Amino acid sequence: MLADLFTAVRLLTVVPLGRTEGGRALRFFPAVGWMFGGLWLGIAWLAREAGLAEGTGALLTGAIAVVASGMLSGLMHWDGLADCADGIGVRGDAARRLEVLRSSTVGAFGVTAIVFVALLQVVAFSVILESGVWWGLAAAPVLGRAGATLAAGLREPARRDGLGARYSVRMSVSEILVATLPVLPLLGWRPESHTALTVATALGLLLAFVVPGPFVRRFGGVTGDVLGATIILTETAVLVAAAVVGGPL
């Protein structure tokens, strides 16, 4: 079990723990999300202490936080988002789209997706920082990685030789419930935040089921890029939801 946790850390971050093999590691993806949530909460706290939690300071902090999260992941998830955007944008069948995913170049669709989603994250982070809805900074990364767990555990891989196949292991309902246990500490936030947090959490889990669907239909299954895109898109949606629904710290 510990080896699978280390493998999940190695896969989702630049921290050199564990091995590069091991399909059961996907059940620990939400737990690894707390590393990113802790990073964002730490940056938010430092920004508040430095007087950068309002106005342009909050926007600057949001940009720093998004870049820091990307660096911790080695930008792999963002690469997956770009590849999936390019794959969806290209004309052709599933085989042609999978060729695009394998390409090392980023096209117009990929660049547009990265810029648009990154801007959404920066703005949402800054709004959360100013309003004090800090639970969103923890919820978004955890639920984003839970989305990847659900995508890999409930859907078939697009090909047998890719990252999606390596980490996609069919999971039972009980295994999925256990895998999402790291989400529960979020519910221990201050009681007055529960309504807003419940809304954002429910949205995040719903999107975790929904987001991979269009990719799976177009690519014929789950790939490593699909998992990365699912993480980023679910994470962003929860950030935006937290910024919109609000609630005290």
Question: Predicted regions: what is each one?
Answer:
Residues M1-G74, W78, A82, I88-V90, ...:
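Hydrophobic alpha-helical transmembrane segments
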